[in-house]
């Protein structure tokens, strides 16, 4: 098979591992920087050009699209879909998961457990907004933040009001979520592939920090998840329409709660924590599904 990987840096761990796994199985691999692509959009023969070359003959494409280039990256991926190339994750599914509000609304519609969440732009009654989610302490998030950036724990009502007013001054849309104290600064990253959780790790925030992101110094260890957690992670990925997803769960007194569904989950932390060949499993999945062209929208979304 000829497999394309949409990535801006072939030296990144996840990209490098996918290349190694694909080549080890005899596939031809080409890494493409989506931002450097340009497209010929027409009714007869849609094309993608890259460094003067017409990209054609691909059987599958693996999108590793960074959050900052979601719009253009998904546009290029959609063009691949229109050309009949199998996407591991569809453009419309990635777009859903990158919109934090939309993704939570989709999870809500499907009845997937998640923290009580308020969404606001210019609330005229901040006190009522806080009471709506159960009062302080609360977690306040910028809608566009990633890797723990733009996430604040406000431990008192006064602090929460100050943070919300500051974010309002930036003309930013914000989410206000209940703080799950019993999680103890830890979350669980479930790596979903197809309709299965193939690996899971526990991420623990460093002392004095509540954000467990590995980019913020959190540590990762192997964890055994419950059947309910497994079911919740798969349901969350399915709600987005993702074949490959990193689903972040919190363990709460009322069961697993989904914090986020990531469409380009990193491989380094979870491969090291679990000792599993996640990259190889992704390529195996492509081998089994690409020939069926099993996409829901085929670029129509």
Curated annotation (Swiss-Prot):
One of its GO terms (molecular function) is ATP binding. GO terms for biological process: protein modification process; SOS response; translation. Keywords: ATP-binding, Ligase, Magnesium, Manganese, Metal-binding, Nucleotide-binding, Protein biosynthesis. Its cofactor is Mg(2+); Mn(2+). Its EC number is 6.3.2.-. ATP binds at residues 141, 178-179, 187, 211-213. It comes from the Bacteria. Mn(2+) 2 binds at residues 260, 262. Mg(2+) 2 binds at residues 260, 262. HAMAP family: RimK (MF_01552). This is Probable alpha-L-glutamate ligase. It comes from Pseudoalteromonas translucida (strain TAC 125). The gene is rimK.
